[in-house]
Amino acid sequence: VEIGYSNLTMAAVAERAGTTKTALYRRWSSKAELVHEAAFPTAPTALSMPEGDIATDIRAMIAAAGAVFTSPVVRAALPGVIADMAADPELSQRVMSRFTGLFDIVRDRLVHAVDRGEVHPDIDPDRLIEVIGGANLLRMLLVPGWEIDDQWIDQTTAIVVHGVIR
């Protein structure tokens, strides 16, 4: 956060941590992986709450993603991490694998909503994940200093829910 992603080096991290670059590379294969783990020490668990109706679940997903994207560490790191991920598909796969459990929960919730008749059966769970993450990411990138608020969450939820409900 202090110097920005583009100015961060593994050597600087090693020096500040009192270790060696070799030790860092044993744990993280790249700066992007190290920064990603620092920004996301654990995968977000927005859906640890009991399953509700799909509108409530979608609102919780949007709010949780917004809280993650507006944290100072993520705000500083994410543009650089995304650039590195775009240039390295293997890195992208490793980084995104940390979210597999969360994405599986979203998929399960959508399947259950289809089974309850709340959601169109042709809604692709992966598109829902992309829309929620993408809306938050774009807002964070386009509006520097943006802080998530209930009005934005409610409006975004209404738009997304309108697209998935029966």
Show where each model-derived region lies.
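Tryptophan-centric aromatic hotspots in well-structured domains and transmembrane helices
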Residues: 27-29, 137-138
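Hydrophobic/aromatic-rich alpha-helical bundle segments in the mid-to-C-terminal region
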Residues: 92, 96, 100, 114-159
